[in-house]
A protein has these predicted regions:
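Serine-esterase "nucleophile elbow" of acetyl-processing enzymes
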Residues: 1-49, 59-67
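Alpha-helical cap/lid subdomain in secreted, periplasmic
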Residues: 29-39, 55-191
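Acidic-and-aromatic substrate-binding clefts and catalytic sites of carbohydrate-active enzymes
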Residues: 50-54
Length: 191
């Protein structure tokens, strides 16, 4: 029997499971879905509520001590909500992606999109940084982590920012095709 696939989801409150009951955070549901597809897995929830890309830089080496086989990277939403300079966010994400590449860890990189209320200029600077980095590092890529969930009240908690369980299900469903391709391309074994 193949050893379980060690998958780390590295990110912020969208990963940590802010406002969700235990066992219903994104990594938990992702682990269940992977098991349904035949991938035995050990899921590591490396989500920290409120984390920024700068925070991610400070803890990536610590996180890599767990020796993940694959990393799902979901960071930058808090940078955006705080109006931090997109160039700084991009540089921080580049540092994290470089560390993952140095360790030979394949990445499913999940992008964020700035909402219109932050202004067209900010969005024009922030939104392209994710596809640019995905190209630079040749990672598997999800252009918008909250695709089909953002701004849909029925799929979010009352704060309008964090997905509820139904929203998590949509996110996992959207991510699975890209993650399955990544795992297959790495020759990861089911079982």
């Amino acid at each position: 029997m193949a050893k379980p696939l060690k998958i780390m989801v590295f990110g912020d409150s969208l990963v940590a499971g802010f406002g969700l009951p235990p066992g219903e955070a994104f990594p938990d549901i992702l682990a269940q879905k992977l098991s349904q597809y035949g991938y035995q897995n050990e899921m590591i929830n490396a989500g920290v509520s409120g984390d920024t890309t700068a925070g991610g830089v400070t803890r990536i080496d610590w996180a890599l001590a767990d020796k993940p086989d694959v990393v799902v990277l979901v960071l930058g939403g808090n940078d955006m909500l705080r109006g931090l300079r997109p160039a700084a966010s991009e540089q921080n994400l580049r540092i994290i992606l470089t560390r993952l590449a140095d360790e030979g860890v394949p990445v499913l990189f999940c992008g964020m999109l700035a909402p219109e209320n932050l202004g067209a200029d900010y969005a024009a600077e922030f939104n392209p940084l994710y596809p640019r980095l995905a190209d630079e590092f040749n990672t598997s890529f999800i252009p918008f982590f909250l695709q089909d969930v953002a701004l849909v009240p029925a799929l979010n908690q009352p704060d309008g920012l964090h997905p509820n369980r139904a929203g998590i299900d949509v996110i996992v469903q959207n991510l699975m095709p890209e993650l399955l391709v990544l795992l297959a391309s790495r020759g990861e074994q089911k079982g």
